[in-house]
Amino acid sequence: MSDHEQAQAQSQDENQIMAERRQKLQAIREKGIAYPNDFKRSHFAKPLQDDHAAKEAEALEAEKIEVAVAGRMMLKRVMGKASFATLQDVSGRIQAFISRDNVGEDVYADFKRWDLGDIVAVKGMLFKTKTGELTVQATEVRMLSKNIRPLPEKFHGIADQETKYRQRYADLIMSEESRETFIKRSKIVQKVRDVMVGEGYLEVETPMMHPIPGGASAKPFVTHHNALDMPLYLRIAPELYLKRLVVGGLERVFEINRNFRNEGMSTRHNPEFTMIEFYEAYSDYQRMMEMTETIIRECALVACGSTTVTYQGKEVDLGKPFDRFTIVQAIKHYNPQYTDAQLSDAAWVASEIKRLGGKLPPAPGLGSLQLALFEECAESLLWNPTFIIDYPVEVSPLARGSDTQPGLTERFELFIVGREHANGYSELNDPEDQAARFQAQVAQKDAGDDEAMHYDADYIRAMEYGLPPTGGCGIGIDRLVMLLTDAPSIRDVILFPHMRPE
């Protein structure tokens, strides 16, 4: 049987099962309320297991612990006048024992017709089976929601991997690993928030639709505001609005929210992604690197219980101080055959990028060429956490220039497992310098660089009130979760990743 024929047969089987279950649902409707909403749960599965699973049967029976649990029925064993069912809730699983003598003949007859996937409620007393499993001996059992579509079998293979992303609801039902990933994601985000609040930062919300896209070099999504008859752009970064708040006197601010970039999709990129950006007055990029280390270590502890984690079979040490290299130092560290003279020769660097199959930057000055070469020959080798520092000014239009190294900025990017995780810098707070850099970006855009920034006159106006010395940083939440949950693809850590239409 071909794959197409097999898929057709499976579809026919599923349609038949769904038709039968709709008939069951109709029978339930005829008896009364098909979707009751008056059940009150008293306990979750895992806390019950944690508190009582180790107890001896006699001791548990003596306590007479009454519970009301509910969840999706994942297993069912009918044995004449009694049956076992396993219910799954958000915390875990617990077994129920349903006997005709305890729940009544009519209810038991109904229960035997129920299907895997039904949402079931059970009231009763805890006891231990002969095999020692903690179980609820049901005195009452009810269906709360009828399953129509049969549960999928265990996901495996490429086709099913796509199904996991498209039907995350089914994936979460069937995969404990997926549920654990997204529970960890929530804990990671909460820990980031806790660290920021503990450091005296104020959480704020800034616009998601911008009249001028800014704060990063990227292609925006464009929409139209009908009432104002004007284009708007889904934000590519909140940076310029957050720095406006620092101008206004909110000296430590952060935002955890979505950014949108109308660019390619890959295992590392989703058009809609989550970041934290934070800004602190009277600080610099050194302080931002310290904050970044703290955030990542604290998140590792809450997600993994350790600062040493394993990613795709290889250890990552987040506990020791992160390494620091300039772009040229990193290139030479991993490519000792290159000489200082070669790396200072723009023409040679450009030819080496081409030889390696890389793409030349839109504005090929020496600094941007060195960065492009770094991306070709060193970036993927940065396994343990490494700050790459002192970026060239031509690729850092919002970063403060170095006082000691002309042409460079006080900027860093953090790389772990060969991919960027954070970007930060001492903020440029000279409005005249910022205006000139915006003009240079406009020139690049006019020359064909559609990722170059627009000129933001209102941001310049804000800076003219005086932006104090400020450090800022952005950390990609999705990539951090990938690292801490050992996920190979960004789609594994986004509940509903973007997909091509079916």
UniProtKB/Swiss-Prot annotation:
Cofactor annotation comment: Binds 3 Mg(2+) ions per subunit.
Species of provenance: Chromobacterium violaceum (strain ATCC 12472 / DSM 30191 / JCM 1249 / CCUG 213 / NBRC 12614 / NCIMB 9131 / NCTC 9757 / MK)
Predominant subcellular localization, coarse grouping: cytoplasm
Chain spans, region Disordered: 1-22
Protein's recorded name: Lysine--tRNA ligase
Key words, A-Z: Aminoacyl-tRNA synthetase, ATP-binding, Cytoplasm, Ligase, Magnesium, Metal-binding, Nucleotide-binding, Protein biosynthesis
Family statement: Belongs to the class-II aminoacyl-tRNA synthetase family.
Subunit composition and interactions: Homodimer.
Gene from which the chain derives: lysS
